[in-house]
Amino acid sequence: MIDIQEIKEALPHRYPMLLVDRVLEVSEDTIVAIKNVTINEPFFNGHFPQYPVMPGVLIMEALAQTAGVLELSKPENKGKLVFYAGMDKVKFKKQVVPGDQLVMTATFVKRRGTIAVVEAKAEVDGKLAASGILTFAIGN
């Protein structure tokens, strides 16, 4: 398990853009993390005041950060940054609302030099909320 302090050591993101609360599992190429979604998230002020829903693009950002924790916690990548380079086959299946816990899984499926491709999914209560293929560049 990786706690919030270690996550902050790996990622450059800070409030309100740090979207990973804890890592539950980590292996060489797969990571499982959580984001506890609360009504106090700043984006709920405008998305939408009467019916708060987590923006899909922020779910994808949370998945990207999850993958970033895995990559940046490797000794050879200490001090580097992960740059989000693209998304493909993104699907949103379930709304994410205050009180939900996003369980995010990212698996690296391809690496070539400084480019990495990840299959990622976010679930709430065991149901798929979002998924997609993410591309990253690792750099200084």
UniProtKB/Swiss-Prot annotation:
**What does this chain do?**
Involved in unsaturated fatty acids biosynthesis. Catalyzes the dehydration of short chain beta-hydroxyacyl-ACPs and long chain saturated and unsaturated beta-hydroxyacyl-ACPs.
Catalytic center residues: H47
Which reactions appear under catalytic activity for this entry?
A: a (3R)-hydroxyacyl-[ACP] = a (2E)-enoyl-[ACP] + H2O
Q: What is its EC number?
A: 4.2.1.59
> What's one GO MF term for it?
(3R)-hydroxyacyl-[acyl-carrier-protein] dehydratase activity
The protein's name is 3-hydroxyacyl-[acyl-carrier-protein] dehydratase FabZ
Q: Which GO terms describe its cellular component?
A: cytoplasm; membrane
**SUPFAM superfamilies noted in UniProt:** Thioesterase/thiol ester dehydrase-isomerase (SSF54637)
User: What are the recorded Gene Ontology BP terms?
Assistant: fatty acid biosynthetic process; lipid A biosynthetic process
Regions that span the bilayer? none
Cellular location(s): Cytoplasm
Q: Which UniProt keywords apply?
A: Cytoplasm, Lipid A biosynthesis, Lipid biosynthesis, Lipid metabolism, Lyase
Q: Name one Pfam family in it.
A: FabA
Family designation: Belongs to the thioester dehydratase family. FabZ subfamily.
The superkingdom of the source organism is Bacteria
Q: Does the keyword Lipid metabolism apply?
A: yes
